[in-house]
Each structure stands twice: as C-alpha cells, then as structure tokens.
C-alpha cells in the first residue's frame, strides 16, 4: 500500500477516534483519569466500590446513597440513571439501574445479584411504563451542559412522582487533581443551580454534597 495513502488512512481514523472521544462523553477516557470502558474501565469498576465505602465512612459518616433511597417507600419503582456499580439502585424487582459502561454493569451484577441492571443511556432510555421516581446520583457532573438538559428532560418523561438528583454541591471547591479527572466539572459547578432552578435544593453536606428534588 502506498505510504502516503496509509498515513492518510491512519490520520483519518485517528481524527475520527479523537472526535468521538471528545463528544461522546460517556466514553471520555479522562473521566476519573481512567474512563468507564475497556481495560481501564474494568479497573475503575473494581476500585469504585472501595472508594464509595471509604467516602461513606470517612467523608460523610453514613451511607450516602442509601440515605437518599430510605427517604422513600421501599415499594416504589425507581429508575436509576448512571447506576455505576449499583450502590444507588433500589433493591426491588420493579426498580432498574442503567449505565453506559458494560464494565460498571458487570461489577454491579456481581455485587448486587438481587438488583436489576442493564446497559442504557440516560439521554435516550425509553420504557413502556413510567417509574415512580427517577434518580441520578453523581452522574451530571460527568456530563456536558447540553447533555445534562437532555438527561433531565428524559427523567421527567419517565417519572410519575419525583426526580431525585444527588451530586457535588454547586459551591464545592475542587482541587486541580480532581478537575484533571473531571473534564466537565467546572461547567457543571457554574451552571447546575440554574439548570435545576425548578428543583428544591437540600444541603446534605455543606459545601460538598447537594440533593435536588423535583415534584411532578
């Protein structure tokens, strides 16, 4: 094959790959410095439960995600956007956790065999039946602005009673190291309060964690 032609093909493939990484945010390899897919996504999925356990014990002093779920009747059907390794997903047979990462879903199924999980995209997921609640825990700070709006709109279309968002406080002051592993965080911090202006905001941990609730 002509060397110039080969170089052009390599350049086109590289450009296409780089373009996808830049704009198809769930597959951005810079998220948490490891990404959520492939080999490094598998490593990320393995260490995530340990990080959650450490944070609950040493930063919050309680099980953060379960403290949100226990605010609601256990019989409620809950759709969990961006479920990760499953700690934020309700434990009953009418609730479901979805995530774009196969690695995260596989790990969630190992840890919580009695919960329901499947691959799904928070912007595009559709269901014949609505859920009582839609939760979104620690997802939106990993999402570009336009896509955050799409996720919120989709959540509203799928929920019967409430939308519950648990995430980094809008007045949080991140370290440079954290910003390096959270490519959309600064935009999130600057805009999330305006984007959720119709939600009731509850301070879970001052300057650290906020809960936003929308009653439908």
Where would I find each of the regions flagged by the language model?
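Hydrophobic adenine-recognition pocket in adenosine-nucleotide-binding enzymes
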Residues: 139
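Conserved alpha-helix/loop element of class I SAM-dependent methyltransferases that forms part
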Residues: 58-74
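C-terminal alpha-helical "lid/dimerization" subdomain adjacent to the S-adenosyl-L-methionine
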Residues: 164-212
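N-terminal, positively charged/glycine-rich alpha-helical extensions of SAM-dependent methyltransferases
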Residues: 5-50
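Class I SAM-dependent methyltransferase SAM/SAH-binding core
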Residues: 79, 84-124
């Amino acid at each position: 094959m002509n060397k110039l032609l080969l170089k052009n093909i390599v350049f086109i493939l590289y450009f296409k790959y780089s373009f996808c990484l830049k704009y198809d945010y769930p597959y951005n390899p810079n998220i948490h410095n490891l990404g959520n897919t492939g080999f490094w996504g598998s490593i990320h999925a393995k260490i995530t439960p340990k990080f959650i356990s450490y944070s609950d014990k040493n930063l919050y002093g309680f099980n953060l995600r379960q403290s949100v779920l226990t605010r609601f009747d256990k019989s409620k059907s809950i759709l969990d956007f961006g479920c990760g390794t499953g700690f934020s997903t309700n434990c009953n047979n009418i609730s479901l956790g979805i995530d774009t990462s196969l690695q995260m879903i596989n790990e969630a199924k190992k840890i919580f065999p009695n919960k329901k999980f499947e691959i799904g995209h928070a912007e595009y997921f559709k269901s014949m039946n609505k859920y009582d609640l839609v939760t979104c825990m620690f997802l939106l700070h990993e999402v570009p602005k336009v896509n955050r709006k799409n996720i919120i709109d989709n959540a509203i279309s799928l929920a019967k009673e409430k939308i519950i968002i648990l995430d980094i406080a809008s007045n949080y002051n991140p370290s440079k190291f954290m910003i390096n592993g959270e490519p959309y965080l600064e935009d999130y911090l600057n805009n999330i309060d305006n984007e959720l202006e119709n939600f009731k905001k509850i301070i879970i941990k001052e300057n650290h964690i906020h809960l936003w609730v929308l009653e439908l």
